[in-house]
Curated annotation (Swiss-Prot):
Protein name per its UniProtKB record: Protein yippee-like At4g27745
Record keywords: Metal-binding, Zinc
Any one Pfam family match given in the protein's UniProt record, by short name: Yippee-Mis18
Gene Ontology MF annotations: metal ion binding
UniProt cross-references to PROSITE patterns, sorted A to Z: YIPPEE
Protein species of origin: Arabidopsis thaliana (Mouse-ear cress)
Length: 106
């Protein structure tokens, strides 16, 4: 009998707290502060910081930095508002820096 495989998870690089599901990845083609980043539809076990307007590669956005709830490691940010119509799909979504997350249970 084959063993059931659970969800593929991403964890905080520092403490291994689960922060995202592979199935929630919308795109792997984003740029973060430290390099490549992934856009997720959902996140878990994170703290969302205060909102601020930030000029990003795709224009002005209101974002809030996100960090691990357990160790406070900065992980990326949440898109709160996109000012350009073409960028509205990002609202409510999360950017995780690839360097800040690791695959867990794969």
């Amino acid at each position: 009998m084959a063993q059931a495989i659970g969800p593929r998870l991403y964890s905080c690089c520092n403490c291994r707290n689960h922060v995202g599901l592979h199935d929630d990845i919308i795109s792997k083609a984003f740029q973060g502060r430290t390099g490549r980043a992934f856009l997720f539809s959902h996140a878990m076990n994170i703290v969302v910081g205060p909102k601020e307007d930030r000029n990003l590669l795709t224009g002005l956005h209101t974002v809030a930095d996100i960090s691990c709830v357990d160790c406070n490691e900065p992980l990326g940010w949440k898109y709160e508002r996109a000012y350009e119509t073409s960028q509205k799909y990002k609202e409510g979504k999360f950017i995780f820096e690839k360097a800040k997350i690791v695959k867990e249970d794969w």
